[in-house]
Amino acid sequence: EVAPNLNRLSEEGIFFTRCYANSFRTDRGTVSALSGHLALPTVSIMKMPTKSRTLPALSEEFLKAGYQTDFLYGGDINFTNMKSYLLSKGYQRLTADTDFSLAERNSNVWGVNDDITSEWLLNQLKERTDGPWFTTYLTLSSHEPFEVPYNRLEEKIPNAFAFTDECLGKLIDELKK
């Protein structure tokens, strides 16, 4: 089983079985998930600020409702104009690879592995006193080339997803305490 933690957690709360962030690239899937905009086949809408600024976003709605809005990604937040999109969507605090040590940034070809960012997020959430907040966490360990410090499954791709599942499971379990 690749995702025992997510499967377990799906039994504990609201679980959407037909909610998809359609795309074959992270930047396009992010816009799909946060703004409800179908991914374009040939270009990332994040690279089109005049268009992406006009899209609705969950973060804007939470901001209007008085929430603090944060985005965590262990990679380069400037890649594909992600930072511009996130700021235009009302995210107040962005945390990315440069907020971590060089050793942590070098833990994955794309940036900071999920075990490190999930531990960082856990510590941040435990210390928060400015709630309510809407925090978006974009994982990266399940990206190609699928190299992670974890060896539960023999095949590389399912193992990378299992690693992310392990990190998310630990994060949620710790937050429940």
Whereabouts are the PLM-identified features?
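Solvent-exposed soluble domains appended to multi-pass membrane proteins
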Residues: 1-177
